[in-house]
Amino acid sequence: MIQQMQMPEKLEVDEASYSNYYGKFIAQPLERGYGVTIGNAIRRVLLSSLPGTAITGIKIEGVLHEFSTIDGVKEDVPDIVLNLKQIRFRSISKRNAVVTLVLRGPKDFVAGDIVSPEGDFEVLNPEHHIATLNEDATLKIDVSVGRGRGYMPAEDNKPETMPIGYISVDSIFTPIRNVKYSVENTRVGQRTDYEKLSLEVETDGSIAPDEAVSMAGKIINDHVRLFSLFSPTQEEEVEEEVQQEDEEFENMRKLLMTRIEDLELSVRSHNCLRSAEIDTLGQLVSKREDELLGYKNFGKKSLAELKELLESKNLSFGMEVTKYRLNQ
């Protein structure tokens, strides 16, 4: 008899250390080898596949390329771009936005100066330094903020129509700062070779750690679930279902191709259908009751007779029959 696999009983959260930025999660007991398998999969998905918000590009008035300097600004453009990449956002509207800023010195340009008039996002590190302007400096800058997953290099971040002076930025969309996992042995009964998985998740505060883990688990589950559809039993069931549907289709097609003259109908009903140029059962069921009553000499008695006939064959008036290709 095959022993049933040991499944983890629950996912525990270390409440003492939990915050909006950090969470430690423990799953046990796991079969040997599953700690690394699950831990590594969740770690990779957390770092690469969760959605987030980041700056995707900028345009600075008077600057034509990313290697320029700006009069009255201490930092050059590469330094400004580097500082902008480190700003963390929480998306509110889940849509892209462009913010235009006009800054005059003397001033310390910080992340908190980037405010969406429409309330599309919130800056999570508003004190983060971007640039220093002296008393003569004026800086006009358009900041594009967008949504994405994981990491997007600048060359893949370029819009289809890029205005002169637009500078694409490497975008770090992922809300995950770091993920670590460790695997230890744990006891179940007399056996000590089961595993305990400890997963530590650090976020930028735009998403709670437990929400991030839940999202990663769903992404993995959605992918892995597809592979469970190909068991031999399910394949046989699907094949039988398809064969049954094909059989039903052909039986219905043959029934609808039945000639009216082969049906047991009164002479009056036969004559009415012949004068209406209705030759097959398929042509009959495609008609509505009011259409039939509009034909010459077609009365309610004939309609009642035909309705009873159709019901005996599990048919009805007004059916859609084009899919049965009755003209072929």
Swiss-Prot record:
Query: For this UniProt entry, which segments traverse the membrane?
Result: none
> What keywords would UniProt list here?
DNA-directed RNA polymerase, Nucleotidyltransferase, Transcription, Transferase
Query: Could you tell me which InterPro entries the record lists for this protein?
Result: DNA-dir_RNA_pol_insert (IPR011262), DNA-dir_RNA_pol_RpoA/D/Rpb3 (IPR011263), DNA-dir_RpoA (IPR011773), RBP11-like (IPR036603), RNAP_asu_C (IPR011260), RNApol_insert_sf (IPR036643)
Write down the superkingdom of origin.
Bacteria
- Name the catalysed reactions: RNA(n) + a ribonucleoside 5'-triphosphate = RNA(n+1) + diphosphate
Which stretches does the entry tag as region Alpha N-terminal domain (alpha-NTD)? Answer: 1-231
Q: Does the keyword Chaperone apply?
A: no
User: Where is region (Alpha C-terminal domain (alpha-CTD)) located?
Assistant: 252-328
Q: Name one GO biological process term.
A: DNA-templated transcription
Q: Does the keyword Nucleotidyltransferase apply?
A: yes
Which Pfam families does this one have?
A: RNA_pol_A_bac, RNA_pol_A_CTD, RNA_pol_L
State the Gene Ontology terms under molecular function. DNA binding; DNA-directed RNA polymerase activity; protein dimerization activity
What Gene Ontology cellular component terms go with this record? cytoplasm; DNA-directed RNA polymerase complex
Q: Known SUPFAM superfamilies for this protein? A: C-terminal domain of RNA polymerase alpha subunit, Insert subdomain of RNA polymerase alpha subunit, RBP11-like subunits of RNA polymerase
List the EC numbers from the record: 2.7.7.6
What is the role of this chain?
Answer: DNA-dependent RNA polymerase catalyzes the transcription of DNA into RNA using the four ribonucleoside triphosphates as substrates.
Q: Report the NCBIfam families cross-referenced here.
A: PRK05182.1-2, PRK05182.2-2, PRK05182.2-5, rpoA
Domain annotation text?
The N-terminal domain is essential for RNAP assembly and basal transcription, whereas the C-terminal domain is involved in interaction with transcriptional regulators and with upstream promoter elements.
Q: Of which family is this protein a member?
A: Belongs to the RNA polymerase alpha chain family.
Share what the entry says about its subunit structure, partners included: Homodimer. The RNAP catalytic core consists of 2 alpha, 1 beta, 1 beta' and 1 omega subunit. When a sigma factor is associated with the core the holoenzyme is formed, which can initiate transcription.
> What's the name of the protein?
DNA-directed RNA polymerase subunit alpha
Organism listed in the record? Chloroherpeton thalassium (strain ATCC 35110 / GB-78)
Starting at the broadest rank, the lineage of the source organism is: Bacteria, Pseudomonadati, Chlorobiota, Chlorobiia, Chlorobiales
